[in-house]
Amino acid sequence: MNLAIGPMTAIVPTLFGIPIDFLLFAAILLGVALFHHHTLRVALIGLAVIVAYKLLVTGFKSGPGFNGLVGHMRQEWVMLTNLFLLLVGFGLLSRHFEKSRIPAVLPRILPHDWKGAFWLLVIVFVLSSFLDNIAAALIGGAMAHTLFRAKVHIGYLAAIVAASNAGGSGSVVGDTTTTMMWIDGVSPLDVLHAYAGAGVALLVCGIPAAIQQQRHSPILKHEHEYVHVDWPRVGIVVFILAAAIAVNVIINVLFPESSDSFPFIGASVASAVLVTAVVRRPDWEIVPEAIKGSIFLLSLVLCATLMPVERLPGASWQTALGLGFVSAVFDNIPLTALALKQGGYDWGALAYAVGFGGSMIWFGSSAGVALSNSYPEAKSVVLWLRHGWHVTVAYVVGFSALMIIAGWYPNAPHKTGIRAAAIVDTRAMALDRDVNLTHVAA
């Protein structure tokens, strides 16, 4: 074990050259991946261990001991509160959309052959651009259950998850990872080009998956009875999204100095949900479960904010590509938090990588876990990889297309002080590599 010190940094114990912080963080993510029925407990225990380690050994960047912890929470509370309110609020928004009965109308437009299965994936892709990707995947799974007489191929389930993650990758309201970027100050336009890769990936995995499904169980064209769309609920969905976007634009354009002082975006969504409750009652019954899921994700995000990101590999397209494969095994939420803290990424490329990359294994994304709860047969890594092979191929092809079409253009730091901090951190990392002040037995 080595103990190294860099300028303006706390002591950073390492094991085999890797900071202990990262080993603890990796252990948490591995525990989440292995113990799917105890994810909240694993995340909270892991957070407690990392906080205790920081308190007793390394201290925080804002200082040692409890004062350092309080200082760190003062820096992060706005981001965490925003994320919590958006996760719960978008969960209620998704239920409004489902109850609008639009999902029951959409299958009417589908062709009778394999192209119908493909266009269903396109619908999921589009829904995910403005709904939470979890909701889009569940809606797609429900429509597939009806259209294919409950005989849904595992390869097609993988494609539904991939379509939902691809559709959310270029939209700041379509995926938790891109929403985190938005909250952190990244412009929505800086993630939009993720669709250059996501669109190609949808074609590459969607067509083989649709053919798989048609051979497994042909599409059943229903002559549905007349479905009455609840347009007031549709209006509520539009109003909530518009409120979030408008408040974010106003704060970041007119009052950028105040953006870190209050959770404006989250508060706008919560207010819009409450105001529109007089028009249609929200599905309050989902709130307890949404809060539980939000606490789990916030625990992982908070763990990520405690990591010494100055010791991570520099941001590059190779790193982003690798993070996509890592996100297939480890939750992409904390990976995104690490990248945001580090800075210097092409956010569109990163959004595509950690979003679509999580589709390669069923537990690599929240959408995959949610859909697999409805289709337990999908909870097999071997079967998912065997029948969903096209998702992995699509990820690589899509990323390549993104690099060819849009290129790699790292965004300038989106927060004041990040540039200077990055310079200091780089110098600290260089010094830490060259100088070990103390050597103790591992």
Give the location of each predicted region.
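Low-complexity, proline/glycine-enriched hydrophobic segments characteristic of transmembrane helices
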Residues: 1-8, 60-71, 312-313, 408-442
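Hydrophobic transmembrane alpha-helices of multi-pass solute/ion transporters
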Residues: 7-114, 254-314
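Membrane-interfacial loop-to-helix junctions in multi-pass transporters
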Residues: 16-22, 79-83, 109-122, 148-158, ...
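Short helix-coil transition sites and intra-membrane helix breaks within transmembrane domains
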Residues: 36-39, 93-101, 127-139, 167-175, ...
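Alpha-helical transmembrane segments
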Residues: 76-89, 190-206, 264-265, 347-360
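Juxtamembrane and boundary regions of transmembrane helices in multi-pass small-molecule transporters
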Residues: 93, 99-102, 150-154, 158, ...
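Hydrophobic transmembrane alpha-helices that form the pore/transport pathway of multi-pass ion
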Residues: 116-169, 180-184, 337-352, 377-380, ...
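Transmembrane helical segments that form the transport core of multi-pass membrane transport proteins
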Residues: 240-345, 422-439
